[in-house]
């Protein structure tokens, strides 16, 4: 429940309020209205809902439909002239975040907040942190792969970072479930569209940066992408940063007056004696660690999570146990065929993460390598060139290009775009299950490997704007072992 006076106070304090327009009359103050719910979905309103008219695709007919369900008030950046009062604001997304925060009782003040950003590794790092903090605390987690608000039930999120109303609703549920910490993945999109506006994190972690999410409906340039990633540093009380990432010098200057830990080859917090399933650390995490996720980049994610959790009350023993216990669905899952050949299933879905995945596999598997890969339709278009240029440097890999959430595009047209940057022959098979079957058929020795990249644990294909059923890469591969 929230009073209209409270709504207006919040908006005025942040410089967001313009006026209320009611039947052509302008008001600066208003009283005697109470809202029992808030919503940005016009299908989920009642007469006591405060509705937020947001989004580039918002249409007046959504409002008209909501009014037929009894809607009496809305917030917008303009007057849609639909016969009910409107609170006009300068920025609807900022307004929605601040009002949601208050409506749900400021749950951020009752939890320790840990956020991860980076082009890749956010989910893995979040899982490490969740397992570490679970040793001695009661964490909740908002993750692309799995979200849990009670530590017992898990569900998949539609967005890396939820819309602000959903975010504060979930944070409030975590508080009601007696959680002590909240671990989040924070995307650049979350800052671009202000889903976390007004939030300050106890610890913010920057894992890495490489060009991604650049396209017509995402970021217009790398500069814009990197800028929105860096906003997490501004909004965190303490920060953890990978000193080996590109453009580290900018971040180092940006956070010099904040509490911080740097990890990587330039500082005390380093990885030593890196092996497939173990490593040693120096600095604040000095000691020996067991790890189930192979690859140096996963060890880096573990160190980042460990340093963050150390600041949030975890002991070194908690960190060791948590890292050793961590597995992530669809992240470096390994199957073995009857003939001994390995199958690696991973969510790698941009050029940089695919490069690291290939390097890890080729370190351990020295025989024939087959790769099953697609690229998403209608988003991240720059990935296609990145994939093609990378694979052009690996003529030893037999590439099978296929569908990966083609959406409104033709998967074979996407495959053609990727292959236009590759100077050696590749296979193109539209059906992803058939592509996996074909790749596994050519690997028949214990040193051979199939890499199935892109979808990870996703059990759907996005086709024509809808999630169509798909068994999942692991289930498909298991059929052909």
UniProtKB/Swiss-Prot annotation:
Molecular functions (GO terms): ATP binding; magnesium ion binding; UDP-N-acetylmuramoyl-L-alanyl-D-glutamate-L-lysine ligase activity
Top EC group: ligase
Residues recorded with modification N6-carboxylysine: 229
GO-annotated cellular components: cytoplasm
Cited Pfam families: Mur_ligase_C, Mur_ligase_M
Reactions listed under catalytic activity: UDP-N-acetyl-alpha-D-muramoyl-L-alanyl-D-glutamate + L-lysine + ATP = UDP-N-acetyl-alpha-D-muramoyl-L-alanyl-gamma-D-glutamyl-L-lysine + ADP + phosphate + H(+)
Enzyme Commission number, as recorded: 6.3.2.7
Chain positions recorded as ATP binding sites: 118-124
Keywords: ATP-binding, Cell cycle, Cell division, Cell shape, Cell wall biogenesis/degradation, Cytoplasm, Ligase, Nucleotide-binding, Peptidoglycan synthesis
Biological or metabolic pathway of the protein: Cell wall biogenesis; peptidoglycan biosynthesis
Positions occupied by motif L-lysine recognition motif: 404-407
Residues where UDP-N-acetyl-alpha-D-muramoyl-L-alanyl-D-glutamate binds: 42, 160-161, 187, 195
Gene Ontology biological process terms from the UniProt entry: cell division; cell wall organization; peptidoglycan biosynthetic process; regulation of cell shape
Subcellular location: Cytoplasm
Ligase as UniProt keyword: yes
UniProt PTM: Carboxylation is probably crucial for Mg(2+) binding and, consequently, for the gamma-phosphate positioning of ATP.
Top-level taxon of origin: Bacteria
Function of the protein: Catalyzes the addition of L-lysine to the nucleotide precursor UDP-N-acetylmuramoyl-L-alanyl-D-glutamate (UMAG) in the biosynthesis of bacterial cell-wall peptidoglycan.
Family listed: Belongs to the MurCDEF family. MurE subfamily.
NCBIfam families: murE, PRK14022.1
Protein name per Swiss-Prot or TrEMBL: UDP-N-acetylmuramoyl-L-alanyl-D-glutamate--L-lysine ligase
Gene: murE
């Amino acid at each position: 429940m929230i009073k209209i006076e409270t709504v207006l106070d919040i908006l005025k304090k942040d410089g967001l309020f313009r006026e209320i327009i009611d039947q052509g009359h302008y008001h600066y103050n208003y009283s005697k209205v109470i809202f029992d719910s808030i919503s940005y979905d016009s299908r989920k309103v009642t007469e006591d809902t405060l509705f937020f008219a947001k989004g580039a695709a918002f249409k007046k007919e959504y409002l008209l439909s909501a009014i037929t369900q009894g809607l009496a008030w809305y917030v917008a950046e303009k007057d849609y002239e639909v016969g009910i009062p409107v609170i006009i604001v300068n920025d609807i997304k900022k307004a929605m975040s601040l009002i949601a925060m208050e409506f749900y009782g400021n749950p951020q003040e009752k939890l320790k907040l840990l956020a991860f950003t980076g082009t890749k590794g956010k989910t893995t790092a979040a899982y490490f942190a969740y397992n570490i903090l679970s040793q001695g605390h009661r964490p909740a987690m908002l993750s692309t792969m799995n979200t849990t608000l009670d530590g017992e039930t898990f569900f998949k999120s539609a967005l890396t970072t939820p819309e602000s109303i959903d975010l504060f609703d979930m944070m409030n549920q975590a508080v009601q479930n007696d959680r002590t910490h909240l671990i989040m993945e924070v995307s650049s999109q979350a800052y671009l569209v202000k889903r976390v506006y007004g939030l300050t994190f106890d610890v913010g972690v920057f894992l890495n940066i490489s060009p991604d999410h650049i396209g017509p409906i995402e970021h217009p340039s790398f500069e814009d992408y990197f800028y929105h990633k860096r906003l997490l540093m501004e909004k965190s009380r303490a920060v953890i940063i990978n000193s080996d990432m590109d453009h580290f010098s900018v971040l180092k200057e940006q956070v010099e007056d904040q509490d911080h830990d740097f990890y990587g080859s330039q500082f005390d917090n380093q990885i030593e004696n890196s092996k497939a399933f173990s490593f040693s650390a120096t600095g604040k995490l000095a000691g020996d660690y067991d790890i189930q996720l192979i690859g140096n980049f996963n060890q880096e994610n573990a160190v980042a999570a460990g340093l963050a959790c150390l600041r949030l009350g975890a002991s070194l023993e908690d960190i060791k146990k948590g890292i050793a216990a961590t597995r992530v669905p669809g992240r470096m899952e390994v199957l073995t065929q009857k003939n001994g050949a390995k199958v690696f299933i991973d969510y790698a879905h941009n050029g940089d993460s695919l490069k690291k995945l290939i390097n890890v596999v080729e370190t351990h598997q020295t025989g024939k390598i087959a790769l099953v890969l697609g690229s998403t339709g209608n988003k991240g278009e720059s990935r296609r060139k990145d994939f093609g240029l990378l694979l052009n440097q690996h003529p030893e890999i037999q590439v099978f290009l296929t569908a990966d959430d083609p959406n409104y595009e033709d998967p074979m047209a996407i495959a053609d775009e990727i292959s236009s940057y590759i100077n050696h022959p590749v296979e193109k098979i539209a059906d992803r299950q058939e592509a996996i079957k074909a790749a596994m058929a050519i690997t028949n020795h214990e040193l051979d490997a199939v890499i199935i990249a892109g979808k990870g644990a996703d059990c759907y294909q996005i086709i024509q704007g809808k999630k169509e059923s798909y068994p999942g890469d692991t289930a498909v591969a298991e059929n052909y072992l």
